[in-house]
Amino acid sequence: EYNGYEAWANYPHEQERFVQLIKKTQANNLLFISGDVHYAEISKLQYPDCYPLYDITSSGLNHAHNFATPNKNRIEGPVMDNHFGLLTLNLSSPTPHIVAEIWDIRDNQRVEHTIALEEICFPEQ
């Protein structure tokens, strides 16, 4: 959604083209990482005939804002303190998955979200 800043929502045509490309190519296991907003969050975007698209945002290791922009797709966060993000890919598990974590500078885990790889792929044809 439009938040008054430079954002993916400002480019609806390009966003639609990108999602169509993902669907056309059946590109599996995509996960987006972003930053430069001075807070952390995890967003989950749903499009028809596509698996959920996750966006992991982490930025603010040395500077954080005291506000977060609106985001109807946010499922975790926002974390407004100085922080860093960590992604761990576990392929040896019976259910391969990605763990997305946000840690603050006081060594406190603020967010942990697990995404099963089978969730971010198209059904086998």
Region annotations inferred by a language model:
Residues E1-Q125:
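Long, structured stretches of catalytic cores involved in phosphate-ester chemistry, encompassing
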